[in-house]
Amino acid sequence: MLEIFDVSYNDLTERRSEDLYKLRKITFKDRLDWAVNCSNDMEFDEFDNSGTRYMLGIYDNQLVCSVRFIDLRLPNMITHTFQHLFGDVKLPEGDYIESSRFFVDKNRAKALLGSRYPISYVLFLSMINYARHHGHTGIYTIVSRAMLTIAKRSGWEIEVIKEGFVSENEPIYLLRLPIDCHNQHLLAKRIRDQSESNIAALCQWPMSLTVTPEQV
């Protein structure tokens, strides 16, 4: 089973946090070459703190994917790291969250789930399920052009709030991610058509999804 659930920073075990930060280093530094802070072969920053929650996707006791959530009223990447690009955007009041450090470990996902399993779409849907379960109003995030393309392809009716440039040829985008029933079911139906899971299982939180890996 693919288990997707959330855990607080304080409740992360040492083994799990080390694995998480090492996979983030592989994704964001080694593969994407982002300007991120790394130490001891791990990637973490000032937003990995007691106000943070992580969404983890685990299969066969191995971490496959993750997202980081922070209350939008707390210091986060939108209001601090990229304040020079998006500081003129008036963010809404209310129970919104910011998501960041979205990743799927491609090697583990392919080996454990198979190359055709729609793990990115499942992770998008899990973000909606998490936010709805915890009573949040919506999600804001900053993404690269590549991630924007993947999100649009999923059918999620995201809203681009503003484009900014971290360098001359490197745009990033501030997005509002809707979490209403309509978008939840759009993604659930897309995933159902590409997997063994039914709509009810896909819209639960936490999530427990049957996956039959491809036969090689």
Swiss-Prot record:
Membrane-crossing residue ranges in chain numbering: none
Superkingdom assignment: Bacteria
UniProt xrefs under PROSITE patterns: AUTOINDUCER_SYNTH_1, AUTOINDUCER_SYNTH_2
Record-level Gene Ontology MF annotations: N-acyl homoserine lactone synthase activity
Keyword annotations: Autoinducer synthesis, Quorum sensing, S-adenosyl-L-methionine, Transferase
Cross-referenced InterPro entries: Acyl_CoA_acyltransferase, Autoind_synth_CS, Autoind_synthase
Keyword set includes Oxidoreductase: no
Function: Required for the synthesis of OHHL (N-(3-oxohexanoyl)-L-homoserine lactone), an autoinducer molecule which binds to a yet uncharacterized transcriptional regulator.
Similarity comment: family membership: Belongs to the autoinducer synthase family.
Protein name (database record): Acyl-homoserine-lactone synthase
Organism: Enterobacter agglomerans
